[in-house]
């Protein structure tokens, strides 16, 4: 347990540029405080001691805003950044050196007993507000975008974004866990593709409109010449056609 506590302490300096000194980290980082209490409550929980592990968890939630069930298994070097609103269920497993942001839920999907919470591999990043629900497996080095909802297994090295979570194939480029701007934007990509398709369809429609307008002009011109209609009637027909097509002669 001591090694885990030391790793929890050191990882903050590696991942948070705002960490100035050990005194500030020890007293002003609720994520570290919640993990410190959890590691003691988890030890008591595994020994079968009733009541006190849950009481410690409750007090930790009161003081830090982070709720970790004493039964949850959390590896070393885990960093809960900001932390407010984080919920980690009883049977959840969090791998070494994972990064969890505020508002994250590692929860269940019902009232089933047994293993009912997710298992996170090593070096997993769970963005702010993300929900990982059910007895699912999240592979090593997975990145879960902010606000995503994950309900199925995710292989190692994949990125998950959106609601419901969609897996993005790994590009082979390894990025720093804190570089949120490099997360793929699948919704934005789809919107750009749809806009490009709309632009192409508009160009095709404009071409067809121009062709129809030219054909209608020639047809009206021949009709007027053959029947000796008054020019005003021909102009009226042209005006109606152009108003229908949305253009002007």
From Swiss-Prot:
The pathway is: Amino-acid biosynthesis; L-cysteine biosynthesis; L-cysteine from L-serine: step 1/2
Q: Pfam families attached here?
A: Hexapep (PF00132)
Q: Which organism is it from?
A: Synechocystis sp. (strain ATCC 27184 / PCC 6803 / Kazusa)
Q: Which gene encodes it?
A: cysE
Q: Name one GO cellular component term.
A: carboxysome
Q: Which UniProt keywords apply?
A: Acyltransferase, Amino-acid biosynthesis, Cysteine biosynthesis, Cytoplasm, Repeat, Transferase
Question: What is the name of this protein?
Answer: Serine acetyltransferase
Keyword Acyltransferase among record annotations: yes
Sequence similarity: Belongs to the transferase hexapeptide repeat family.
Give the GO terms filed under biological process for this record: cysteine biosynthetic process from serine
Task: Report the subcellular localization.
Answer: Cytoplasm
Gene3D superfamilies associated with the record: Hexapeptide repeat proteins (2.160.10.10), serine acetyltransferase, domain 1 (1.10.3130.10)
Q: Name one GO molecular function term.
A: serine O-acetyltransferase activity
Task: Kindly indicate whether the keyword Acyltransferase belongs to this entry.
Answer: yes
Question: Catalyzes what?
Answer: L-serine + acetyl-CoA = O-acetyl-L-serine + CoA
Record-listed E.C. numbers: 2.3.1.30
Principal EC category? transferase
